[in-house]
């Protein structure tokens, strides 16, 4: 009961052409079996995080239908709970529809959480991680905030809508900035972090006072000098779904058996809602391609 989980919605800089007009990225079909949001929720429930808040900015229907009460994610039915939370004031100008505005609209629900720590993960990135281990690494280090990052060597042509971390030799975070595509080796920030709930709430309030356009990443970047913010490296498969090419590439990459092994582990199930429908029949004249 040390931490509760937050699954955040995608930022205003992220847009998957042709698909996001109808549903949020978390509700996108993935590998023909899952939805993208299954990965962060399964990571949390596998890590014994039983209280989870899923934030939805717009077009909630498909996420609500898929996630529902969350029973299919193996959440403890007595002590656990999955909440779907919405932004009350969806602004016409998208620049103000930030994660901070969504948290502010649901401050009452946040304030009621009795857990000392909060683990935040995005609904638009695909990876496997033991959040319990991540939380203990954070507590043992004595840092104020711990951010998860993935080291990549193709940042010039990929991850262009992601943020990257500036790290010192001790893995202290000096900056969180947009990836400008000017360097191939970068530490991509996975929009995943852990901190004390108390600090999280105070950062939300401070961001609100600074600017209505501020995101959690913006306020964390401001705090790099005054707070002890550290980075922890993620190993294994990682995909950030922030535009159509990255969505296609993530699905295709997992046709590779080695990549699939990095994401799916025998003792780390990815839960999803099952829909029992008639199986597809392929006849002699069918032409099927990947």
Residue ranges and their predicted role:
Residues 1-31, 42, 47-49:
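N-terminal nucleotide-binding beta1-loop-alpha1 segment
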Residues 1-9, 198, 208-290:
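Left-handed beta-helix
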Residues 33-54, 66:
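A short, N-terminal amphipathic alpha-helix
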Residues 53-57, 148-150:
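Short internal beta-strands
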Residues 58, 121, 195, 242:
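A conserved hydrophobic position in a structured secondary element of the catalytic/binding core
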Residues 61-84:
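Acidic donor-binding segment of Leloir-type glycosyltransferases
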Residues 81-164:
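Conserved beta-loop-beta/alpha segment of the NTase-like Rossmann-fold superfamily
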Residues 128-207:
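Conserved core of the sugar-phosphate nucleotidyltransferase
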């Amino acid at each position: 009961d040390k931490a509760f989980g937050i699954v955040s919605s995608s930022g205003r800089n992220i847009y998957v052409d042709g698909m996001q007009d109808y549903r949020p990225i978390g509700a996108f079909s993935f590998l023909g079996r899952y939805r993208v949001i299954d990965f962060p929720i399964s990571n949390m429930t596998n890590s014994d995080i039983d209280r989870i808040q899923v934030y939805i900015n717009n077009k909630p229907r498909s996420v609500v239908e898929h996630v529902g009460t969350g029973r299919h994610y193996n959440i403890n039915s007595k002590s656990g709970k999955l909440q779907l939370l919405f932004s009350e004031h969806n602004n016409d100008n998208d620049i103000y529809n930030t994660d901070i505005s969504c948290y502010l609209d649901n401050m009452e629900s946040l304030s009621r959480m009795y857990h000392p720590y909060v683990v935040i993960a995005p609904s638009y990135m695909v990876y496997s991680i033991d959040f319990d281990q991540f939380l203990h690494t954070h507590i043992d280090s004595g840092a104020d905030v711990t951010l998860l990052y993935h080291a990549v060597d193709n940042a010039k042509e990929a991850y262009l809508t992601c943020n990257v971390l500036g790290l010192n030799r001790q893995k202290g975070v000096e900056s969180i900035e947009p990836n400008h595509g000017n360097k191939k080796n970068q530490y991509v920030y996975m929009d995943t972090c852990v901190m004390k709930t108390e600090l999280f709430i105070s950062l939300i309030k401070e961001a609100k006072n600074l600017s209505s356009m501020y995101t959690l990443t913006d306020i964390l970047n401001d705090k790099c000098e005054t707070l002890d913010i550290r980075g922890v490296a993620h190993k294994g498969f990682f995909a950030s779904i922030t535009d159509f090419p990255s969505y296609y590439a993530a699905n295709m990459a997992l046709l590779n058996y080695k990549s699939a092994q990095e994401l799916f582990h025998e003792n780390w199930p990815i839960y999803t809602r099952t829909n029992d429908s008639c199986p597809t029949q392929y006849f002699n004249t069918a032409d099927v391609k990947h």
